[in-house]
Design a protein with these regions (language model features):
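C-terminal domain-boundary segment and adjacent tail
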Residues: 36, 161-190
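Active-site glycine- and acidic-residue-rich loops that bind
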Residues: 121-130, 155-165
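Structural preference for beta-strand elements that scaffold enzyme active sites
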Residues: 25-27, 51-53, 91, 113-114, ...
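His/Asp/Glu-enriched short active-site or ligand-binding loop at hydrolase and phosphoryl-transfer sites
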Residues: 98, 103-139, 179-189
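Active-site beta->alpha N-cap acidic-glycine motif
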Residues: 1-61, 69, 73-83, 122, ...
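Alpha-helical scaffolding segments of alpha/beta enzyme cores, especially the outer helices
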Residues: 14-17, 40, 44, 72, ...
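A short acidic, helix-capping loop that chelates divalent metal ions and anchors anionic groups
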Residues: 60-65, 153-157
């Protein structure tokens, strides 16, 4: 499980309770501006053993940024997340997943690996809990990286209540089917 655009209360808090109850680890791709506003959530995520990764300093389309702007965003975002979490940040998912070879090169120069997803239920559109769950189940495969959202761009945050409710159902269904949940770095090492 991966979560983008947070941390953002109350959704990240609710999500952490579910993950802790079910003893599931996840990877949180954070917008560093959101992390700065909610350092207590970053600390809580790290303390619970989840992986923290960079989504961006600001939630902007990297393909529309100059190389200098990309570098500045990545370096600042990484620095903020490492300071707040105490973790070494090694992964980044550019906003919207938009990337090209220049973006990938900039990430690599900053010690980061680009990560996208393989299951995308489009939860940010709030299609309903059952639709989110059904879309995940339809796309699911061993080694899947599931993209969900616990926040949104710093300027606007839609409700993530449907996502939070869907996470409980997803975890229970997938555990019943014999799936295990690991962080992205753990998955990459397998």
């Amino acid at each position: 499980l991966t979560f983008d655009d947070g941390p953002y209360p109350p959704y990240t808090d609710e999500l952490l309770k579910i993950l802790e109850q079910r003893q599931v680890k996840a990877t949180f791709f954070m917008v560093a501006e959101n992390a700065e506003k909610h350092p207590e959530l970053v600390a809580k995520i790290a303390a619970q053993g989840h992986e923290i990764a960079l989504h961006a300093l600001k939630h902007r389309d990297f393909l529309k940024l100059s190389l200098a702007e990309q570098q500045k965003d990545i370096a600042a975002g990484k620095r903020i997340l490492e300071k707040l979490s105490g973790q070494k940040i090694t992964l980044m998912r550019p906003p919207h997943g938009f990337r090209d070879w220049a973006v990938i090169d900039t990430l690599q120069k900053n010690g980061l690996t680009a990560v996208n997803w393989s299951v995308i239920p489009r939860d940010w559109t709030n299609p309903g809990v059952s639709v989110i769950v059904d879309r995940i189940m339809e796309q699911l495969h061993p080694g899947a990286i599931i993209l969900l959202h616990d926040g949104d761009s710093p300027k606007y945050v839609a409700s993530r209540e449907e996502t939070i409710q869907a996470v409980s159902v997803i975890i229970d269904k997938l555990c019943a089917e014999g799936y295990n949940f690991v962080t992205v770095n753990e998955l990459m090492q397998k």
